[in-house]
């Protein structure tokens, strides 16, 4: 399982190698020069050496060490984003364009690694990194349980089912075309983002209710005698390169599908 997870992470980073993060003054030297790619590579090397030794990740430093490594990855991302904001200055335009897309692309490189947005030259092969880290954390929690507790905590063994069936997939600007920004205006989602060495595509990881699922007629497990239920797709804001009605190009927060929830109403007259 651990080897599979590392393979997924390496595959994920390979999708982003065409768009390296911009070097920020004062963030060079030491382990910061390597960045989170170096930390991930070190984790992969440790796991590989551990699996060759005794067949378990513990021989390469232990699963807790690996967890700390990926926590360091997230910390580095947050630190780099904060330093990038300082470099832009307090008067910099943070949300509604300005300065041209090419200039903004470099200053917003840190945003390429948001949880549900990626800028890449090919379709991402795996879910966003933060989703993989969450799944891996759940795996570590299960690994620390006894076999008996692990069996009883398995959702499949307990008969757990989702209230609403959902699907998640990467989509492009060609699929979205338009979106609603934070001011309620309809904007055009640009397919390509100018970068230093060319252009890359924007990808969005969307989650919505499955129209072919078993919950299209209502939520699972709800007493239909007393409640009306419906599975509905909800949205959240992410940052993307867009163009407004005045043909002004800039980075804006737009709404994309991010979850499928159950809504209930009480039946009247009961």
Swiss-Prot record:
It holds the Pfam family NGF. GO terms for biological process: cell surface receptor protein tyrosine kinase signaling pathway; modulation of chemical synaptic transmission; negative regulation of neuron apoptotic process; nerve development; nerve growth factor signaling pathway; neuron projection morphogenesis. Residues 19-151 form a propeptide. Disulfide bonds join 164-231, 209-260, 219-262. Glycans are attached at residue 144. Residues 1-18 form the signal peptide. It comes from the Eukaryota. Belongs to the NGF-beta family. Promotes the survival of neuronal populations that are all located either in the central nervous system or directly connected to it. PANTHER family: BRAIN-DERIVED NEUROTROPHIC FACTOR, NERVE GROWTH FACTOR NGF -RELATED. This is Neurotrophic factor BDNF precursor form. It comes from Cyprinus carpio. The gene is bdnf.
């Amino acid at each position: 399982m651990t080897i599979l997870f590392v393979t997924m992470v390496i595959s994920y980073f390979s999708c982003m190698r065409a768009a390296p993060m911009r070097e920020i003054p004062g963030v060079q030297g030491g382990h910061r020069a390597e960045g989170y790619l170096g930390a991930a590579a070190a984790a992969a090397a440790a796991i590989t050496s551990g699996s060759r030794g005794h067949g378990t990740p513990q021989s390469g430093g232990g699963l807790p060490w690996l967890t700390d490594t990926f926590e360091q990855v997230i910390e580095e991302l947050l630190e780099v984003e904060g330093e990038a904001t300082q470099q832009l200055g307090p008067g910099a335009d943070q949300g509604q364009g300005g300065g041209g897309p090419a200039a903004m692309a470099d200053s917003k490189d840190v945003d390429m690694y948001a949880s549900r947005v990626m800028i890449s030259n090919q379709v991402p092969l795996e879910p966003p990194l933060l989703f993989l880290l969450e799944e891996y954390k759940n795996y570590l929690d299960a690994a620390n349980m006894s076999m008996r507790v692990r069996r009883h905590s398995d959702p499949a063994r307990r008969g757990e089912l989702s209230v609403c069936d959902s699907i998640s997939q990467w989509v492009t600007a060609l699929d979205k075309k338009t979106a609603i920004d934070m001011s309620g205006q309809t904007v055009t989602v640009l397919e390509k983002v100018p970068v230093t060495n060319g252009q890359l595509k924007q990808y969005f990881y969307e989650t919505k209710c499955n129209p072919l699922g078993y919950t299209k007629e209502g939520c699972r497990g709800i007493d239909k005698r007393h409640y009306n239920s419906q599975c509905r797709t909800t949205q959240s804001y992410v940052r993307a390169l867009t163009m407004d009605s005045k043909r002004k190009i800039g980075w804006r927060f737009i709404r994309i599908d991010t979850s499928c929830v159950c809504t209930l109403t009480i039946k009247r007259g009961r």
